[in-house]
């Protein structure tokens, strides 16, 4: 295992992201070609009419304002209608370069594998070392505790990997629709959709960066534990399991942290509100069920008491035989 040839998370990531990235490139190219003609025509008409009104004095605006608007139109048109320009300044930065730069700055792994693969493989290698050093009858307990330890690490890695894949898949969909939302920035009535798109793009980018940072930090912590000297599995088992559980809980909280850092993404706010509604419905259902159970119990007890009274009255009416 020292060569890190087994990389399950990196392989699964490739199976998921490679076709999605191809679909994103196709979508960006198709949208750029589709909106190129109408957007260029609208830009030319707007610049001509706006410039004519400013030149003739029909609009009380300066040439500086005209130049600012022309620069905005040129930039937006170039970003929305040119797929290569969009890929260079949007897709490559938010989908690849930013996350890779932060990962390379924080990650000191001796292998180019995914950080979760590195954690899993190092844990498995250390477990095999402890198992090989145990005596014959102790191997059963070492194997049991080692299996539980590896399961805890697997749960931690799967939780982080799911959050990472969720952020990357969401980025694929958001970036794929980028040319359309960028073109909406030209009009005051639709500029709010571009602002929402930028907020959501930053939200999931921050989420992806947080996953890389937390994964690297937890990797260093686990490796610090695994690199220590342990005479038995009983000393190695507790810290690894506790760190894995804490890491899984932190990964679960990352979407909320990313949403707060990006001033609130619409998806997570909706998810939190939906979760609150579901919790309220469940608690209301539980209260209703408890009240119904109490009502049924009181009804049954009342029926039983009435039956007992009737039985006593019947015994008194019959008298002695």
Swiss-Prot record:
InterPro entries noted in UniProt: Conjugal_tfr_TrbL/VirB6
Pfam families, A to Z: TrbL
Lineage top rank: taxon: Bacteria
Compartment(s) of residence: Cell inner membrane
Membrane-topology annotation of the record: Multi-pass membrane protein
UniProt keywords, alphabetically: Cell inner membrane, Cell membrane, Membrane, Transmembrane, Transmembrane helix, Transport, Virulence
GO aspect biological process, one term: protein secretion by the type IV secretion system
Keyword Electron transport attributed: no
GO cellular component: plasma membrane
Transmembrane regions listed in the UniProt entry: 30-50, 59-79, 142-162, 169-189, 206-226, 231-251
Keyword Transport tagged: yes
Family statement: Belongs to the TrbL/VirB6 family.
Chain's role: Component of the type IV secretion system VirB/VirD4 which could be a major virulence determinant for subversion of human endothelial cell (HEC) function.
Protein name per Swiss-Prot or TrEMBL: Type IV secretion system protein VirB6
Name of the encoding gene: virB6
